[in-house]
């Protein structure tokens, strides 16, 4: 790397992409900063504090997939338009795979290596496809070390009762006192059917706000049924006459 060179230059990134470097990509400065550095006599200017080793980026840390946005809806339903869309990216990597998300109107393009993804991103970003300006963004890379979930931390797995083998520094947890709002209970106890409750007292400019607690419909219906039951006349039971007894020998 030349003296005074310390940031990424877009043109040289494209050259590095075309060269298909096997392991690492070296980022160089943007043109405005490199020109300023050359004007200072090659001393680096404001970029002299950057270590050249920090400019080397491992390819494993670069994304190998891009997300295509602002696409024509025909890409998701028309097979011919879809084949034309895929051919744009297969020129950079023949092993490219595609994932279509119709509801999000986006397509994920998976490349076999990060260099192909960077090459397609540089050349196809903001290009016109089917009358719309297509935009490409790098997909976020995820590095999962293990396919299993990590166990939870053991600091909150103990109950209030002491465990069989308490760890060092473990202490008994005391039950918290229940919180009781006595003001609310007192206000509720004062309420009753048919009584009023003044929420806000009246002032010189505002009226008072009073709440009248009404009886429930079920209680009213029960009272009406009880009143009707009391008003009904009691049924009179008529006693039947006992049949006269006639001896058998007289019949």
Curated annotation (Swiss-Prot):
Tissues expressing this chain: Highly expressed in heart and skeletal muscle. Also expressed in all other tissues.
User: Which InterPro entries does this UniProt record tie to the protein?
Assistant: Calcipressin, Nucleotide-bd_a/b_plait_sf, RBD_domain_sf, RCAN1_RRM
Q: Which GO terms describe its molecular function?
A: nucleic acid binding; protein phosphatase inhibitor activity
Q: How is it modified after translation?
A: Phosphorylation increases its ability to inhibit calcineurin and decreases protein half-life.
Composition-biased stretches (Acidic residues)? 216-227
Q: Positions of the region Disordered?
A: 216-251
Cellular component per GO, a single term: nucleus
Q: Which UniProt keywords apply?
A: Phosphoprotein
User: PANTHER family, alphabetically?
Assistant: CALCIPRESSIN, CALCIPRESSIN-1
Record-stated family = Belongs to the RCAN family.
What's the stated role of this polypeptide? Inhibits calcineurin-dependent transcriptional responses by binding to the catalytic domain of calcineurin A. Could play a role during central nervous system development.
Name of the molecule in the record? Calcipressin-1
The species is: Mus musculus (Mouse)
